[in-house]
Amino acid sequence: MILGLDAPTRGHATIDGRPYAGHRAPLTVVGALLEARSLHPGRSAYHHLMALAHTHGIPHTRVDRVLALTGLTHVARKRVKGFSLGMGQRLGIAAALLGDPATVVLDEPVNGLDPEGVLWIRTLLRSLAAEGRTVLVSSHLMSEMALTADHLIVIGKGRLLADTTVDELVRTSGGASVKVVTPEADRLRTLLRGARCTAEAPDTLLVTGLEAPEIGRTAAAHGLPLHELTPQAASLEQAFMDLTRDSVEYQGAPA
């Protein structure tokens, strides 16, 4: 909808005060990676980018710049039909950055990248944001978003479920717990009224609803030995799963 490829049921989307199609040279305003494989298979990476630069009035020097930025200089003259998924993804990112836009929209940018490539895109996204650009990323990899994103928008079945920071979503998810290891697990469970205790092993409890100091004081007051008392922070993935539990379109049967 931001790029005008689909119409909202109500409202409108603008970039710098105009719809995407209303800009004379859209690539210089917003760069987007949606489907990296939507390329002419007979063109080289270099000529693909040159064609985009020509149609949008972008200086040809930007082509060499983004090829170097994405690590594609050595394959710039090869036809894209021979590119791997990861190479195609890098070319899509190069095209998104070709116009040096202030806004970047990337859909699943790490798709097909090897671990080195994932680290590269993570660093790239942060550097783009540090330059003052707006970077919008759509991803299902919550572990990666936890390392990259500053702000999250979560949508489920067309409804806005969250519009908050990563830290705030995790903090309010209610998933934080405390791992307790004690030979008196059954006795401690009885004493921790108001908390949810899940037995992970005969001597191990995962306690939700109480902080570690309070659990420690309760155990000390009743002479219960503790071998471990470790706060377990909720993960972004768990917070996301809890938030979207009722908004999943397709649910498989338990294995």
For the regions a protein language model found, what residue spans apply to each?
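ABC transporter nucleotide-binding domains
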Residues: 1-137, 142-150, 154-156
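A generic structural signal for secondary-structure junctions
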Residues: 54-57, 171-174, 193, 220, ...
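Structural motif corresponding to alpha-helix initiation and N-cap regions
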Residues: 60, 77, 88, 163, ...
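A short linear hydrophobic-aromatic micro-motif
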Residues: 71, 195-198, 225-230
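ABC transporter nucleotide-binding domain
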Residues: 121-210
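C-terminal coupling/interaction segments
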Residues: 211-255
